[in-house]
Amino acid sequence: MAASQLLAAAVAAAVFLAALLVPPARCQQQQVANPGPRVRQAARIDAVRDELAAEVQAKYGFCMANVQEDFTQAFSFSNASFVSDCMEETQGQMTGMLCGKAEIEIYVKSLGKKPSTRVSRNCDQNSWALGCQPGWACARQDSSSSGREVPSRAVNCRPCYPGFFCPRGLTCMIPCPLGAYCPLATLNDTTGLCDPYSYQITPGSNTACGTADSWADVITTDDVFCPPGHHCPTTTQKFNCTEGYYCRKGSTEEHKCIWKNTCKENSTKEATALFGGILIVILSVVLLLVYNCSDQFIKIRAKILSKSRRKAATIAQESATARGRWKLAKELVLSHELEMSESDQLAASSNEARHATEGNGKRSKNRKKLAHARTERFRRAYSQIGRERVLQPDNDKITLSGVVALAAENRSRRPMFEVVFKGLTLSIGKKKLLQCVTGKLSPGRVTAIMGPSGAGKTTFLNAVLGKTTGYKKDGLVLINGKSGSMQSYKKIIGFVPQDDIVHGNLTVEENLWFSACCRSSKGMSKSDKIIVLERVIGSLGLQEIRNSLVGTVEKRGISGGQRKRVNVGIEMVMEPSLLILDEPTTGLDSASSQLLLRALRHEALQGVNVCAVIHQPSYTLFNMFDDFVLLARGGLIAYLGPISEVETYFSSLGIKVPERENPPDYYIDILEGITKTKMRGHAAPKHLPLLWMLRNGYEVPEYMQKDLEDINNVHELYTVGSMSREESFGDQSENADSVHQNVREPYSLLDRKTPGVLAQYKYYLGRVTKQRLREATLQAVDYLILCIAGICIGTIAKVKDDTFGVASYGYTIIAVSLLCQLAALRSFSPERLQYWRERESGMSTLAYFLARDTIDHFNTLVKPVAFLSTFYFFNNPRSEFKDNYLVFLALVYCVTGIGYTFAIWFELGLAQLCSALIPVVLVLVGTQPNIPNFIKGLCYPKWALEALIIAGAKKYSGVWLITRCGALLKGGYDINNFVLCIVIVMLMGVLFRFIALLSLLKLK
């Protein structure tokens, strides 16, 4: 420890020593018979104590939280027998041998320097009294001298009394603080030292060994410290620690061990490793119970739901069958197909009434059985779905006007959504991705988009949806005849990405239900949501796997085709007005593809505008679509119109599909030049986009003028056997007025209100809880590694009394930061794609972030316990468990926020690298003395380390005061800043969470 650092630390301790007039005066009062002078002397002593306490608090408050308490712990002797003995032996002259304020200042200034600098005027070159020897003192000659001057001391010199220490060159004595052991020394003839101290007396003099000669920090000298394994109730008594107790260095009393057998005689520490093991076992059992019971709770809840669902389905089926029978009987009676006599009619009437009564009785009993709200909701859902199936018309015969009529009752929930695009062009640099795309996507129809690979099918969908950041876009996109941004309508637009972006650690039903809850209309009842959910599950054929986990790459779940249908169902349950699908049938077999298309056609019957990119559909599947968009390379339209007219159109150009050829595949082969064919006139397959433009009267771009010149008799080509522009849309032109009336009616597409932030937060909270409970293995590994790290660091990096554990706590902060930060990456890194999809659909980022952070608070609260259960009991520091817990709680909270930020900013590999590197760098920066304080203040390890040091320093009192002040001064710490350090670390955690939230909002 540097001399300058020791100096300031020792000044604080030395000023305490000036207050030590109290013990001897108190003992002296016992010798005075007259109480009057004793009272006046006590008052003067109290005044001096208060004055010194105020001075110490002002100058050295950084190492003393409470001066009065520190005074009491250091110098309030409950047993002052050594003072009484001293007074008796000196016949009341002990007070004159005590050091004054000026002499104490000399002692303080000499700390950290050579002993030769510690001399008073009584021990200079001209005068060296006998009391100048270490461990010796002399009486004051002039009692009237000022406290600011060193009094003359040259008489009655003698060895220092037990319980006091006499510095070399001062000729006075100072009481030893509590926790010190200052007996009279004995001369060691072999070494010439005065045992148990480290000083020598002048050879050949008539002096003898006195008591201690110094009190300083433990690094400079530990001669006066009560040795470990012993306790010193007074500064002149030393006792062995008895069995069942332990005594640390500088102890004034024995500390009882919780288990007597863990502490043998002269034990210095309690064997707390056993308690750490017990706490680990308890923590493990609790965590296992929580995760296992919670997992069982999820399974039990799923079984209850399944039972209620089956029961409700049975009741709904029975009700539907009964209604069908009564309806048939009624029709037979009304049509007079059943002849009966009047008596028969009366009997039938009576029988009907009886059956009705019985039916009512049965319904009454059923209502009692359906008292549970869950079963009642499922019953209503299945009843509604059953009625829809009965009333559902044949999809192949429905017209657009029929679609409009069927969708009229749902328009309040699903407004009609028509998309018209005119001259849509998309480019990046000089490359054209889409060129002059004109047409429309109509509500109530299912449109297929096809074309060669690289023709721009997905790009076309993104351009229509407005997801064209970084591209140059020209042309118009009209929504119900009005110009506007598609992003404004994202709450009623469903987009199914090409990749199956679903949550693998949720079941099929949980994925769909979450989407239905968060994206449906705000006022939609739970019963209606269940109806929608059951309808989608039924239409997509997901009944058998509804309770199966979707699965991930690491953990197998449902099949790829089933996963694809779940991907589509996530958008269907929110009841969109516009449903866009990017290759929904990829990876599906023919049966699954047809099942999916039937579900999409059912959506179209509700007035939904459905558009899908398709690859190589079968002929049956192709004919299930209403409209067909064929894109050529370069993003040009080769055909856009009804499926029923596509072969007629291409036949008019001389392109006829051979038998047993699939029309869409044949047309794509023509566009790619794989199949050669001879077209009418001088046209070639590369001219198909140009011919489509000419046929519809679209403006031909300049770069296509040359191709236009290559075609002879273009106009004749279209006047002979070709369709008119109006005819190309078949049914659409037939009902144009009806569609226009329903699509253009004054209904705001922005009226749908989805659940607010708080409601979504609740749904997210439930989802994240289920995900965490299904990650029990990962959580267990995290806690196991923390416990192992605590054992290693607690065993190897011991907290030393001289440094208060600065080095070991640095390693501890690195380990906890690294492990908890890496674990926090899992909160956001694995779900980046899912989050993007949910955010683009209009779901709340704030609710998503807060829910994940809220669930992570469980780990924030428990992980410090897991780590301390091993570290604290294997390291056994002096600080209290609760103080350590508060520090590590703040630390885990802070680094978790940093982990969030890295998980959002970087890919998983880079985020892991940063999480491993940053804690090490920040600990090094925060502990280097040559780094500016401003820079160190920005490092959370600096504040965490200071809090840990302060937590330990508070437990060092009495003889440890100088050591405490020196250690705190060296690190620049303040013992009063424990709460401040905790608050700063927590605020850093809040700051990084705020940065992470902003990053989520801006993430592309």
Curated annotation (Swiss-Prot):
Positions of disulphide bridges:
none
Keyword field contains Membrane: yes
**A GO term, aspect molecular function:** ATPase-coupled transmembrane transporter activity
Instruction: Fetch the SMART domains from UniProt.
Output: AAA
User: What membrane topology is annotated for this entry?
Assistant: Multi-pass membrane protein
Instruction: Provide the Gene Ontology terms for cellular component.
Output: membrane
Q: What is its main location?
A: membrane
**Entry keyword annotation includes Membrane:** yes
- Induction info: Up-regulated in shoots by cold, heat, salicylic acid and 1-aminocyclopropane-1-carboxylic acid (ACC). Down-regulated in shoots by mannitol, abscisic acid, kinetin, benzylaminopurine, indole-3-acetic acid and gibberellic acid. Up-regulated in roots by clod, salt, jasmonic acid, salicylic acid, ACC and benzylaminopurine. Down-regulated in roots by indole-3-acetic acid and gibberellic acid.
Q: What domain of life does the UniProt record list for this protein's source?
A: Eukaryota
Keyword annotations: ATP-binding, Membrane, Nucleotide-binding, Signal, Transmembrane, Transmembrane helix, Transport
The record's subcellular location field reads: Membrane
Transmembrane stretches in the record are 271-291, 776-796, 804-824, 886-906, 907-927, 943-963, 978-998
A GO biological-process term: transmembrane transport
Q: Which residues form the signal peptide?
A: 1-27
Tell me the ranges covered by the ABC transporter domain, including all copies: 419-659
Span list, region Disordered: 343-373
Compositional bias ranges of the Basic residues kind: 362-372
Q: Which residues bind ATP?
A: G451, P452, S453, G454, A455, G456, K457, T458
Family membership noted in the UniProt record: Belongs to the ABC transporter superfamily. ABCG family. Eye pigment precursor importer (TC 3.A.1.204) subfamily.
Protein name according to UniProt: ABC transporter G family member 25
Q: Please report the organism this UniProt entry assigns to the protein.
A: Oryza sativa subsp. japonica (Rice)
